[in-house]
Amino acid sequence: MSPTTAANQAKKLIKVPEMRRIKHIHFVGIGGAGMCGIAEVLANQGYKISGSDINASKTTQQLEENGIKVYIGHEAENIKNANVLVVSTAIDPENPEVKAAIEQRIPIVRRAEMLGELMRYRHGIAVAGTHGKTTTTSLLTTMLAEENLDPTYVIGGLLNSTGVNAALGESRFIVAEADESDASFLYLQPMAAIVTNIDADHMDTYEGSFDKLKDTFVQFLHNLPFYGLAVVCGDDANIREILPRVGRPVITYGFNEDNDIRAIDVERDGMRSHFTVLRKGREPLRLTINQPGLHNVLNALAAIGVATDEGVSDEAISRALKGFSGVGRRFQVQGEFELGEGNVKLVDDYGHHPKEVEATIKAARQSHPDRRLVMLFQPHRYSRTRDCFDDFIEVLSQVDQLLLLEVYPAGEKPIVGADSRTLARSIRLRGQVEPILIDPVEGNLQNIMQNVLQPNDLLLTQGAGNVGAISVELAQHHLYVK
């Protein structure tokens, strides 16, 4: 069989047989990280794709460059001739496009339901967990690619090596993040699943019950077939608690001795980490991951667990980790700029939960031990700020200098006592760091930076809101990055 014939047959495997009646798919909120990737994969399958978003962005521009019609603003006429609407949790039920679809009896499906259809007829691998999903999904995708398995992937961030967050591969594999924030990962029925950790986040979805959140993860793992595989972090106390209830094949990973896959002899080397992985029935394997932090060693172990089970060679695993160039906004180095007799390094990170922020701080200390750590932090959602208030106080007090932006609401209404001013006051009372409130709209960010930053500082922009755009602006227009 010629390579061309094989590729064409592989493409046929990607088709969704039961969606043959669907020609035109419209995405409401197409600029979202989870939405745009699915839209691009479906467009590459030959479906007509359109979408709308409230604001233009780099993402919507890229979608248009790829031939997808994007409307800025939500209007009923945008859905003309659509056969189905795909919506994210963030979309208001009163959205005019949603209301028009209801009136016209056009099916409305959630993002994860459409992802589930993509996964239904393939060898699906879903990566779940409160933290680390994007990096773990990216690592596993890279390992499969190094073995020339050419997976389809849908990732919540830009894979730096490809410049995109989704692509249609020619093999039976599809790797995707499984989102627990709205419990929509229950739509997925993968062949293999990873759970990186379980932590208290998005608790409004689970009526404030952590037990209900854990129950939902058990239900997710039971979406696996009886011959599937769950690869879970055995170091996580909440995962260990639910394991007796999981009636599927399980492999555990972590640093503890009782795990099936373990990392030992970890050495930290600037922006890299070296470790030896132990797997049952295999020789020890010394590896280097081109990312700092113990949390990234755990992410690598998760990917190794699935990759090994899928037949990826040790050589491909090693190449993937050593050459891994990271994911957009995951400890992403933006560059350096001169200040006095030294320089300041600018790093941007998406982490927005206290445990994610703490992991980033540890990675920053590990990779740049001689630099003072200045953090520009933007809390994400009033509800998370309220629910994790004490944890934020403890974690944010670990930096040398803290600059606080106002809470990014993500569609939420303000909650009394869950704003940045109250958070700053509580951090100040703890007495370890003196936070500075910043309103970039007033144009005082640059002035404050000039007064706060010192030669050889590490400036870390942190959060899931528009602080990432501020980081890019600092890099491109103000800080003269080399």
Curated annotation (Swiss-Prot):
TM ranges: none
Binding site for ATP: 129-135
The keyword Nucleotide-binding is annotated on this UniProt entry: yes
Pathway: Cell wall biogenesis; peptidoglycan biosynthesis
Cellular component terms per the entry's GO annotation: cytoplasm
Subcellular locations according to the entry: Cytoplasm
Signal peptide span: none
Entry EC number(s): 6.3.2.8
One of the Pfam families matching this protein, by short name: Mur_ligase_C
Presence of keyword Cell wall biogenesis/degradation: yes
Uppermost EC category: ligase
UniProt xrefs under HAMAP family: MurC
Protein family (similarity comment): Belongs to the MurCDEF family.
Protein name: UDP-N-acetylmuramate--L-alanine ligase
Naturally occurring in which organism (per UniProt): Acinetobacter baumannii (strain SDF)
